[in-house]
């Protein structure tokens, strides 16, 4: 389905749609990208105007020529309007260089369901530097994916934007950390002379498609003898796009493999490996576990899937596809269309700026931006945990043992079912609630104040001294099952069992509990299960086998409120001018001094911290860091048509524990063999300081299952590479923790670009640029499977076994790995290790990974001016990824991942525009190229 978005701006109409040879996202529109040689007003005036010296992103030295040594894209406010975009995020997310995948509002189950990030060149959201008026801002408060930093493009009001400049190559020698894949600089509006009102409405042409938008703007300003002022107000309202509105996603049958429905009501006999068999007419009680003392049967006879809720009986094919569960069946539910593709969002914003001339050579300026956003996202159907109804199986390893026969509940003295092998009971049950959904809401407040002085010295040098403060506050609210209430409901705690005994919780009911020594584990963990070993007759069948209303589910849930905040305080001073006159022109010079303090804090709720909520994780923590930087640039004209630029910068980061400093250098070249040809090249060292969350993230708790490679080696079954360590060495319900690492160092790399700009005729520009970006020592968390394997290798080598098939690990690494894996648990193997089985695993971020990008950007733009028919504009842009490589660990070779799922080969955009007097129309198209679907 193609969606058309209509823009009404006075008498202006814009239409946007998407095409692709393999449709990937048919609801995305693209920004009209323009090189700096292209002006939005170029077609309105055929007279060539003399340009003054201006400063553009990529260098602090002002220049006359708009095209320079570094590839730059400029998106003006007119370009945004012509493309039909209504937000800054729309504009930047549709850059052809935005080829990487992200987890934001498109992934409601993640840590950042209100975030709108971009990912240039697939280096990650945190490796593109974002500036506002050339100055750094605060990060999004919640860590990206729970571990790194990112910028939220939904936090900049469009009403305050004059243009967006995008440097598409690395530039750490100019801007410092984060400028790896590029720099995006948002220039705020200034110097308005009249009042302007905008009313913009958009939406899909098909009823119920969602995404309807309304944007109201009012802006104005004025000038006095020595002052100027500008203001803008904005209100933005966007409806959610439900998954059900997209025909390619509204049924489980849309999946490429034919699709399978979800198992909405599941009752599985673990011991028999079967399910109770449900048909459209009857829930057949094919299993005879003594849940009901009167009949000895599961109370499902005579029930249908429809009786238990909005379920349906799966087909025999669907049953068989759930291997190895083809013995029985289950009640099915279609959950594929639940949730939202984009959030419901309301935003209000205010912007105010002004200048005042203190003297003829000194000016004071100030800018203030405030934005409040309310966001609501929907994830999927509410569901219960898997529940073990009965059975004496104990999990410490993937082995089981029989608890001694007993007929007395130690807590109540009543009869309990555990008579021995003949009546072994072990049922796993889960229910997905029809019509009851999970989701979160976010309230965000951001404010920025920027004020300073700027002027011109007697020798012509221009200077600017400023202070910028940015704050970002977010409150996330969700509704989650209170674990105790859910447990009480499922197991009828407070009621009586089939024999009249009170239904209570005792140590036999706790997952992995050992009654002989009082050992218990939390059954309400993120991936934990509740159990009813002692009193299976207390199980609340009505909770599963009857229709549950939303009110029934809501009664078991509580609000979970978790705030987060981030801030940035920046002092910046710049100086630019001409040092001296050289034979071929002036020696340009620019210098910058910066001091920035930034920080963040995430506060999990006490319920979440204590593990009292079911089905939710989280990560808390916080910290701050001070950064000092000094940079300098020189423009050296070496001939009439060759200009060389040199830059260097020193950054020092102090997080009160570890100091990180980095010196970077860069160079660019411009060669103009003809008036209409520019050959350019650039190189810059790149670096990224460790993200604050990587260093200061609080403890994140989870549960995992892993192979005990060390036990396998200890038993003599390891072989050359652990190929004999199968399921017998698996351990489930290992408690895991993620913590920060204050000992991280900076990521380092290089960025290269070479290209040509050609103007074959008036008003036509062609550009071709090739890029090569390398980055090493990337901060990442090693997979838990790799950690447990490396632990075995380190312990084996310490015992004298060389294990030549594995790389050489330094002693420091082995000490860290062994320390991250906690042992001491009971081991029920014949030959247990002296250290015991794994009980806990700690993962910490480390500098281990590497990445490389090779690609080409091309662009063609043309403006055709007529006397009567109006003015026509045409632009087409393309970003082609030649190769993407990644290494997961130190010493690993860089391997191409171009054939990975959802890695696009290219992205193209097209813009068409027409204007005549007060009328105009525009169309923008985005194409996402071929990618693998595995």
Model-derived features with residue positions:
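Gram-negative outer-membrane beta-barrel transporters
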Residues: 771-933
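Transmembrane beta-strands of outer-membrane beta-barrel proteins
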Residues: 195-199, 229-231, 360, 364-366, ...
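N-terminal periplasmic "start-of-domain" segments of outer-membrane beta-barrel proteins
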Residues: 52-83, 89, 140-145, 195-198
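Surface-exposed beta-strand-turn/loop segments characteristic
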Residues: 90-96, 100-114, 123-125, 135, ...
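Transmembrane beta-strands of outer-membrane beta-barrel pores
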Residues: 201-205, 224-226, 235-239, 370-374, ...
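Structural signature of Gram-negative outer-membrane beta-barrels, strongest in the C-terminal barrel
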Residues: 479-492, 594-595, 621-717, 724, ...
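Short loop/turn motifs that connect adjacent beta-strands in outer-membrane beta-barrel proteins
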Residues: 191-195, 225-226, 359-362, 456-462, ...
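Hydrophobic, lipid-facing positions within transmembrane beta-strands of outer-membrane proteins
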Residues: 116, 182, 212-218, 227, ...
């Amino acid at each position: 389905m193609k969606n058309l978005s209509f823009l009404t701006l006075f008498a202006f109409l814009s239409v946007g749609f998407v095409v692709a040879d393999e449709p990937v996202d048919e609801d995305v529109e693209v920004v009209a990208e323009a090189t700096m040689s292209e002006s939005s007003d170029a077609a309105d005036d055929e007279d060539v105007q003399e340009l003054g010296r201006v400063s553009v992103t990529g260098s602090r030295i002002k220049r006359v020529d708009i095209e320079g040594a570094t590839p730059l894209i400029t998106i003006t406010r007119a370009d945004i309007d012509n493309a039909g975009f209504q937000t800054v995020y729309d504009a930047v997310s549709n850059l052809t260089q935005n080829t990487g995948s992200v987890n934001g509002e498109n992934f409601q189950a993640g840590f950042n369901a209100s975030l709108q990030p971009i990912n240039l060149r697939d280096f990650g959201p945190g490796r593109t530097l974002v500036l506002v008026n050339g100055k750094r801002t605060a990060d999004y408060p919640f860590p990206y994916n729970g571990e790194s930093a990112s910028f939220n493009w939904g936090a900049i009001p469009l009403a305050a934007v004059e243009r967006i400049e995008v440097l598409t190559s690395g530039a750490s020698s100019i801007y410092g950390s984060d400028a790896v894949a590029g720099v995006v600089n948002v220039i705020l509006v200034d110097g308005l002379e009249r009042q302007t009102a905008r009313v913009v409405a958009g939406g899909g042409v098909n009823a119920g498609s969602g995404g309807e938008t309304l944007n109201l703007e009012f802006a104005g300003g004025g000038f006095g003898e020595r002052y100027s002022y500008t203001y803008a107000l904005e209100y933005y309202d966007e409806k959610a796009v439900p998954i059900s509105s997209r025909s390619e996603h509204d049924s489980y049958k849309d999946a490429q493999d034919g699709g399978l429905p979800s198992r909405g009501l599941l009752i599985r006999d673990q011991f028999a490996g079967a399910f109770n068999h449900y048909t459209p007419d009857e829930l057949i009680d094919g299993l005879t576990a003594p849940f009901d003392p009167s009949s000895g049967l599961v109370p499902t006879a005579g029930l249908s899937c429809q009786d238990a809720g909005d379920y349906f009986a799966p087909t025999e094919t669907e049953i068989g596809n759930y291997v190895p569960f083809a013995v029985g069946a289950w009640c099915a539910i279609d959950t594929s269309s639940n949730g939202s593709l984009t959030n419901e969002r309301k935003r209000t914003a205010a912007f105010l700026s002004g200048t005042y001339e203190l003297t003829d050579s000194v000016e004071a300026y100030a800018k203030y931006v405030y934005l409040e956003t309310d966001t609501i996202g929907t994830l999927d159907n509410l569901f219960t945990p898997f529940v073990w109804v009965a059975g004496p199986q104990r999990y410490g390893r993937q082995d089981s043992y029989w608890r001694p026969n007993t007929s007395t509940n130690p807590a109540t003295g009543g009869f309990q079912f555990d008579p021995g092998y003949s009546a072994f009971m072990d049922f796993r049950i889960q229910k997905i609630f029809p019509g009851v959904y999970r989701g979160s809401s976010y309230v965000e407040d951001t404010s920025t104040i920027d004020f300073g002085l700027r002027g011109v010295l007697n020798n012509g040098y221009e200077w600017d001294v400023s202070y910028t403060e940015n704050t970002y506050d977010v409150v996330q609210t969700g509704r989650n099952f209170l674990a105790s209430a859910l447990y009480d409901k499922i197991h009828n705690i407070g009621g009586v069992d089939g024999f009249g005994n009170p239904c209570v919780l005792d140590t036999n009911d706790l997952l992995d509990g050992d009654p002989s020594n009082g050992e218990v584990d939390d059954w309400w963990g993120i991936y934990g299960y509740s159990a009813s070993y002692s009193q299976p007759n207390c199980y609340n069948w009505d909770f599963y086998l009857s229709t549950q209303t939303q009110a029934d589910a809501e009664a078991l849930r509580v609000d979970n409120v978790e705030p987060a905040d981030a801030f940035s305080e920046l002092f910046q001073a710049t100086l630019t001018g001409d040092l001296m006159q050289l034979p071929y022109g002036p020696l340009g010079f620019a210098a910058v001094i910066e001091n920035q303090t930034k920080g963040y804090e995430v506060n999990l709720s006490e319920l979440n911290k204590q593990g009292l909520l079911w089905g939710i994780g989280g990560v808390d923590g916080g910290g701050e860091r001070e950064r000092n930087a000094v940079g300098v640039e020189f423009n050296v004209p070496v001939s009439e048509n060759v200009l060389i630029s040199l830059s260097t910068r020193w950054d020092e980061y102090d997080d009160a524990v570890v100091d990180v400093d980095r010196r970077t250098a860069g160079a660019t070249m411009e060669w103009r063999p003809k008036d209409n040809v520019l050959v350019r090249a650039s190189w810059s060292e790149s670096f990224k300081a460790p993200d604050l969350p990587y260093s200061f993230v609080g403890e994140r708790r989870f549960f995992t299952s892993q192979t005990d490679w060390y036990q396998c080696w200890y038993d003599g079954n390891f072989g050359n590479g652990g190929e004999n360590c199968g399921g017998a060495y698996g351990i489930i319900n290992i408690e895991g923790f993620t913590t920060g690492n204050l000992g991280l160092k900076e990521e380092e790399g290089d960025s290269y670009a070479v290209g040509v700009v050609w103007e074959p005729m008036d008003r036509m520009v062609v550009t071709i640029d090739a890029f090569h970006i390398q980055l090493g020592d990337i901060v990442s968390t090693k997979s838990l499977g790799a950690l447990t394997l490396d632990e075995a290798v380190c312990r084996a080598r310490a015992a004298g076994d060389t294990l030549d098939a594995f790389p050489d690990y330094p002693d420091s690494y082995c000490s860290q790995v062994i320390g991250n894996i906690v042992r001491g648990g009971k081991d029920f193997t014949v030959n247990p290790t002296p250290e015991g089985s794994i009980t806990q695993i700690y993962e910490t971020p480390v500098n281990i990974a590497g990445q490389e990008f090779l690609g080409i950007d091309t662009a063609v733009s043309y403006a055709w001016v007529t006397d009567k028919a109006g003015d026509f504009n045409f632009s087409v842009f393309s970003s082609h990824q030649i190769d993407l490589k990644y290494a997961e660990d130190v010493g690993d070779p860089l391997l191409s991942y171009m054939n990975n799922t959802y890695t696009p080969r290219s992205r193209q955009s097209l813009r068409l525009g027409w204007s005549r007097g007060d009328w105009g129309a525009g169309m923008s198209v985005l194409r996402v190229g071929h990618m693998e679907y595995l």
